[in-house]
């Protein structure tokens, strides 16, 4: 049936868990339609930035000092001392909430991703769409992205990226919080600690341990 063919294998592959261990909202995110509309989302206005996301992020940050490759704590220690405790009125923290508190209550769990790129100089069109998802459990990747279709590229050759779900460990990039019963209970304990941090706002997928779409 539809669930077995399109939902079960893909979901368990992405999350590394049996569907019965996952919250219902994960399944409810999958739209079921009886129309020929092939858009995943139903927002009235949809699109991607001309020139890609790098350009729009650069414009958003224009004139704002940005430091990369520096740990949050070392940055705060460098800029905020006992003699000058109020350098920042508020700090927006979008990293992992358990890492912020040095994992003192235990580790929250996340899913990570691994990307595999391939350039095909003799292939002008690999799959005909920007993104194709693979729902079969036995296929190790969840989707293939063909980049030229995002902006109607017409150049010779094509580049594809295969996206593989992966277990997360410290040092890996955390992409998705795993909102099962155990993790939600632990997050609530961390949230109680966060409420005592008067100068810090916790936001984003990692700071609020919640699956947000990027437009949220």
Where are these regions (language model features)?
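Mid-domain catalytic core of redox enzymes
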Residues: 73-193
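Active-site/ligand-binding neighborhood in enzyme catalytic cores
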Residues: 1-90
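Conserved beta-strand termini and adjacent loop/short-helix elements that scaffold enzyme active sites
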Residues: 69-71, 147, 203
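Active-site-proximal flexible loops/turns
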Residues: 78, 211-212
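An active-site-proximal "capping" alpha-helix that borders the catalytic cofactor pocket
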Residues: 215-216
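Short FAD-binding loop at a beta-strand-to-alpha-helix junction that anchors the flavin cofactor
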Residues: 195-210
